[in-house]
Amino acid sequence: MITTAEILKRAKAVSRKAPLTTEQKNFALAKMAESLVSATDDILKANALDVEKAKGTITDVMIDRLKLTPERIKAMADGMLEVAKLPDPVGTVSDRTAHKNGLIIEKTSVPFGVVAIIYESRPNVTSDAAALSFKSGNVCVLRSGKEAFGSAFAIVKALKKGLTDCGIDENYINLIEDTSRQSANELMTAVGYVDLLIPRGGKGLISACTENAKVPCIETGTGICHIYVDKSADLEMALNILDNAKRSRPSVCNAAEVCLVHKDIAKEFLPLLYNRFNSGENRVELKGDSGVVEIINVTPASENDFDTEFLDYVMAVKIVDCIEQAVEHIAEHSTYHSESIITTDKASADYFTSAVDSAAVYVNASTRFTDGGEFGLGCEMGISTQKLHARGPMGLKELNTYKYIIKGNGQVR
């Protein structure tokens, strides 16, 4: 097994090479996508072993996150091809100033260098992160969780073949083979080798990285996403949005976890919500505050339920007196990911979008749209819930920093 230290040395060495052209990167992405599809059988075999080992240790919903199919692998390859079609951010001049002495000052996008990604049980993150890192001019160091390691290893093997097939150093994409906490800690403290660290996973992983990292770290959020049903809401629309935001894929970070309902419509709306979530497949367990349990027969919610990312068919429900109370609740319990208001009142919509301090704020739409693909970014590196550098879905532009390039003809000061 290659040590983490050796992988980081190789990655840093590659990051210092002459940059690849846009044409080289796009051709390589196409080759990697082709290689990924060609390796479908090997990837599925590795994934089947991962799934078998994980059964009984993680929930069925998380098993779905872990499981790959030929269709999902094809979607991963298609995602790489979409990244190839996107504009190359490297070398983009975002600001240009002509000094009175003739100097030309250009603010120019450049790669970070080595980007490390620590993630858990989602094999598709492997190809998404590799594609975005590569197109944005970075070298990636991937550290998968143990549940998905076999799948990640097979995926990286295919991607490396795609690189070597077009004569590009395979060490642009690297996978840490040690899935222990020690390897994660090594990445967090690899000053001089890791230029940017991005954790993708649960609250524990993200907290560990933000608290212990000595390298620059972007906090990608857990998703305690709220949907507020205003007193003026179209109730059928609200039901459809809540159904989608909770049941379409509950294990992802943009799924809704909390529903806030205005008191004026609670007696009419809550029975409708209860009936909707108790019909069809994948019924949703509702946990309600004291006002909710007086109207519908659901489990009483604890205070902790409003601070829980369930990642399952469970939702906490609370009645609020007014929109201001809804916003106050969100401010207290949100992870600053995605929130939505269902309303027909423009003043309420404007107040909500202004007052709620999250990365994505919706009006009359599902929180499930907070996604790089849906936002036109191709795939995504993660959803940043911080305010510095990047916020919301992180695409190619967010994987570049900038430098000032100053051109003169002999000026001195």
Language-model segments: which ranges?
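Flexible, glycine/charged-enriched surface loops at secondary-structure junctions
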Residues: 20-26, 90, 166-173, 249-255, ...
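Short, well-ordered beta-strand elements within core beta-sheets of diverse protein domains
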Residues: 13-20, 260-261, 312-321, 336-341
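C-terminal core of ALDH-fold dehydrogenases
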Residues: 27, 323, 328-413
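Rossmann-like NAD(P) dinucleotide-binding subdomain of oxidoreductase/dehydrogenase enzymes
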Residues: 85, 94-232, 236
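N-terminal Rossmann-like NAD(P)+-binding subdomain of aldehyde/semialdehyde dehydrogenases
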Residues: 1-105
